């Protein structure tokens, strides 16, 4: 039973399937030599270096790590991940379907692959130019929501709709915010059916919808949840007052 592993400074790369399904593994010390964890761009082979390590809860990547390969930590027990400044590439499904609530992507990262963060609740991209990669990385077939921040802009959106951002029309966070406006009714319906008043409030606050979008939600959805209705009416009133003030 392997419950911890330490890598010597002389080792530069961890190869495919090295610790796949090591269910007792809890601690990893990458040392000062490891730069590459598995394969990044291969469409033929997955890396699965720590795939399925269900007891692994927390990983801190040291400063020399440059690449995290395809499916490297997929389906592991990870709850907290600290990515290093200097990291450049994150492969397909690298952290997909873990238990990570929030993840910060350093500005040094310039390439993030398909479904890399599928299932993560909140992702912060320090590099705002990573918007297209953000959509690509957050695609998932699981029905859920995701909060994305890039630079000083944020959106809150349904994860499966991210694939619709890949037609070339979404290149900036402003484009993504417009996309969030277009999907407002779909997302509002989803949250109301779940009876998720906190999620509904979060959607309204983060996406900061315009008056017309808020009115469209009111006119097109049956809202039986009194709390959600109160949140919506409050936002509509705020936008109405702001528009009245602007027109004076």
Regions inferred by a protein language model and the residue ranges of each:
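Ankyrin-repeat helical register
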Residues: 191, 220-221
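Non-Sec secretion/translocation targeting segments of pathogen effectors
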Residues: 246-248
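Structural signature of tandem-repeat unit edges
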Residues: 1-13, 23-43, 51-67, 76-89, ...
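Alpha-helical DNA-recognition elements
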Residues: 238
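Terminal, non-catalytic domain-edge segments
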Residues: 241-242
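Ankyrin repeat structural motif
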Residues: 197-204, 226-234
């Amino acid at each position: 039973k392997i419950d911890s592993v330490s890598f010597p400074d002389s080792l530069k790369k961890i190869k495919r399937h090295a610790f796949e399904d090591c269910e007792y593994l809890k601690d990893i010390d990458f040392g000062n030599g490891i730069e590459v964890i598995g394969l990044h761009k291969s469409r033929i082979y997955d890396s699965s270096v720590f795939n399925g390590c269900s007891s692994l809860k927390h990983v801190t990547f040291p400063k020399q790590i440059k690449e995290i390969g395809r499916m490297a930590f997929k389906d592991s027990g990870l709850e907290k991940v600290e990515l290093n400044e200097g990291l450049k590439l994150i492969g397909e499904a690298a952290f997909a379907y873990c238990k990570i609530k929030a993840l910060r992507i350093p500005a040094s990262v310039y390439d993030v692959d398909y479904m890399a963060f599928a299932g993560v609740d909140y992702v912060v991209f320090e590099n705002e130019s990573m918007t297209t990669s953000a959509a690509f990385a957050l695609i998932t077939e699981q029905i859920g929501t995701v909060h994305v921040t890039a630079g000083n802009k944020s959106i809150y959106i349904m994860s499966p709709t991210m694939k619709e951002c890949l037609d070339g029309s979404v290149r900036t966070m402003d484009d993504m915010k417009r996309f969030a406006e277009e999907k407002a009714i779909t997302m509002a319906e989803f949250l109301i059916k779940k009876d998720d008043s906190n999620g509904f409030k979060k959607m309204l606050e983060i996406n900061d919808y315009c008056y017309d979008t808020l009115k469209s939600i009111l006119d097109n959805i049956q809202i039986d949840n009194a709390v959600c209705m109160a949140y919506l009416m409050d936002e509509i009133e705020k936008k109405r007052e702001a528009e009245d003030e602007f027109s004076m």
